From Swiss-Prot:
SUPFAM superfamilies: Photosystem II reaction center protein T, PsbT (SSF161029). InterPro entries: PSII_PsbT (IPR001743), PSII_PsbT_sf (IPR037268). Found at the monomer-monomer interface of the photosystem II (PS II) dimer, plays a role in assembly and dimerization of PSII. PSII is a light-driven water plastoquinone oxidoreductase, using light energy to abstract electrons from H(2)O, generating a proton gradient subsequently used for ATP formation. Belongs to the PsbT family. Pfam families: PsbT (PF01405). The chain crosses the membrane at residues 3-23. Keywords: Chloroplast, Membrane, Photosynthesis, Photosystem II, Plastid, Thylakoid, Transmembrane, Transmembrane helix. The gene is psbT. The lineage of its organism: Eukaryota, Viridiplantae, Streptophyta, Embryophyta, Tracheophyta. GO terms for cellular component: chloroplast thylakoid membrane; photosystem II reaction center. It is a single-pass membrane protein. It is found in: Plastid, Chloroplast thylakoid membrane. The keyword Transmembrane helix applies. GO terms for biological process: photosynthesis. This is Photosystem II reaction center protein T.
């Protein structure tokens, strides 16, 4: 059960960070840094 909780926490944290960066810097020019 601990693995499930840790996985969920990791995914949610990554999602929050991704959303924060995405909304902080609106993609005006398509940057291909991550992909």
């Amino acid at each position: 059960m601990e693995a499930l909780v840790y996985t969920f926490l990791l995914v949610s944290t990554l999602g929050i960070i991704f959303f924060a960066i995405f909304f902080r810097e609106p993609p005006k020019v398509p940057n291909k840094k991550i992909k």
